[in-house]
């Protein structure tokens, strides 16, 4: 479907199809449920609880989100189911998150949540318990059927496109999923919600990592991983400060280093250019294009391709090494089934091991993998 509206014939055809919408209590899933109902589908909601907060945890908004999701479903006249995936989330997302930080890498738990929870555990529950034909989410992506396979495309709203977070989906999973708001710009989504009297129309978008909520990242991480303070050094080996733990820092970071006004240095800001895990040293240098911060390419492993085949050896495509980044033109060299070497057309700053590299051919999200090592020269 390439539109948010449906013809009478499409509405009639859709009327026999049951869609389970992941209701988060936000505006995007609210409007997704409304649009699917308008398109004639049998729509029901499913609210996931993925994190078990304790009684003193004032940061997790799960109870408020559930209340908002219920209010929207009541307004739309659809049933809301609830499910607790906290155990699956802990085992498959949170433990991975901690292990990566412990290893000095910078993971993206939202990508792992989509892979293990929203499009695996959720889809299985919708199939086995709720007898779904499709699931639907409020993600800003699109789908297109081509040659018997379903492709995933960037969302219409370039500022909100979330294909970066969904690259681990297979074409089979994409074929079972509907993404109504992917055809819209965000202001239009809010306008529809307000017109339909949905309580979530002006609700603030959620940001950051869901299980951390509004609390400080450093405080949260310290409750699970012991901090190991160490020295901050320049590339020349001069000690210019102390850090509270390498896990609190990422390549390219500028703020929160606690250094500045150094003798014999210019006024350029300091950036993290390396993390020496063996010596527990944070290496910093001045200037956002310092040679230690730049990479000519990278090795990417743990590959996943939406169509299960991926690009050809030597393909010239584009890549994002972080969310909302401009596309980076690149050439791909296949090393083996789970590893590729990627050469950028121009050097790129602050490419970060542990983060995801996601590849595109025009509007089509091809898939991606985890950045393993960097190519410096």
From Swiss-Prot:
Residues 160-162, 322-323 are annotated as: Interaction with tRNA. GO terms for biological process: tRNA wobble position uridine thiolation. Disulfide bonds join 113-210. It is an enzyme of class 2 (transferase). InterPro entries: MnmA-like (IPR004506), MnmA-like_C (IPR046885), MnmA-like_central (IPR046884), MnmA-like_central_sf (IPR023382), Rossmann-like_a/b/a_fold (IPR014729). It catalyses: S-sulfanyl-L-cysteinyl-[protein] + uridine(34) in tRNA + AH2 + ATP = 2-thiouridine(34) in tRNA + L-cysteinyl-[protein] + A + AMP + diphosphate + H(+). The active site is at residues 113, 210. It holds the Pfam family tRNA_Me_trans_C. Its EC number is 2.8.1.13. This is tRNA-specific 2-thiouridylase MnmA. One of its GO terms (molecular function) is tRNA binding. Belongs to the MnmA/TRMU family. The keyword RNA-binding applies.
């Amino acid at each position: 479907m390439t539109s948010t509206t449906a013809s009478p014939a499409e509405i009639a055809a859709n009327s026999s199809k049951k869609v389970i919408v992941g209701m988060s209590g936000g505006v995007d899933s609210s409007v997704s449920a409304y649009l699917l109902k308008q398109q004639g589908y049998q729509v029901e909601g499913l609210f996931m609880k993925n994190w078990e907060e304790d009684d003193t945890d004032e940061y997790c908004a799960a109870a408020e989100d559930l209340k908002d999701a219920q209010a929207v479903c009541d307004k739309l006249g659809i049933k809301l189911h609830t499910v607790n995936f906290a155990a699956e989330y802990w085992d498959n997302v949170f433990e991975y998150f901690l292990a990566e930080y412990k290893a000095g890498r910078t993971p993206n738990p939202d990508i792992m949540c989509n892979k293990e929870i929203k499009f695996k555990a959720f889809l299985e529950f919708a199939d086995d318990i709720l007898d779904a034909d499709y699931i639907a989410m409020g993600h800003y992506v699109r789908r297109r059927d081509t040659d018997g396979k379903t492709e995933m495309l960037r969302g219409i709203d370039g500022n909100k496109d979330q294909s970066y977070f969904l690259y681990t989906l297979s074409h089979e999973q994409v074929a079972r999923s509907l993404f109504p708001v992917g055809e819209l710009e965000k202001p239009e989504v809010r306008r529809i919600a307000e017109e339909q009297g949905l309580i979530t129309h002006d609700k603030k978008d959620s940001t950051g990592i869901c299980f951390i909520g509004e609390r400080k990242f450093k405080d949260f991480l310290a409750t699970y991983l012991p901090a190991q303070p160490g020295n901050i050094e320049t590339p020349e080996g001069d000690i210019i400060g102390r850090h509270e733990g390498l896990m609190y820092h990422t390549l390219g970071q500028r703020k929160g280093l606690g250094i500045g006004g150094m003798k014999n240095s210019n006024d350029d800001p300091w950036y993290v250019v390396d993390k020496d895990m063996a010596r527990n040293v944070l290496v910093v240098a001045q200037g956002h294009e310092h040679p230690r911060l730049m990479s000519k390419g990278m090795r990417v492993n743990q590959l996943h391709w939406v169509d299960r085949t991926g690009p050809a050896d030597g393909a010239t495509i584009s890549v994002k090494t972080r969310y909302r980044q401009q596309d980076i033109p690149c050439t791909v060299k296949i090393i083996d089934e789970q590893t590729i070497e990627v050469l950028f057309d121009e050097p790129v700053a602050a490419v970060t091991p542990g983060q995801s590299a996601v590849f595109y051919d025009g509007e089509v999200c091809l898939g991606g993998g985890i950045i393993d090592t960097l190519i410096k020269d």
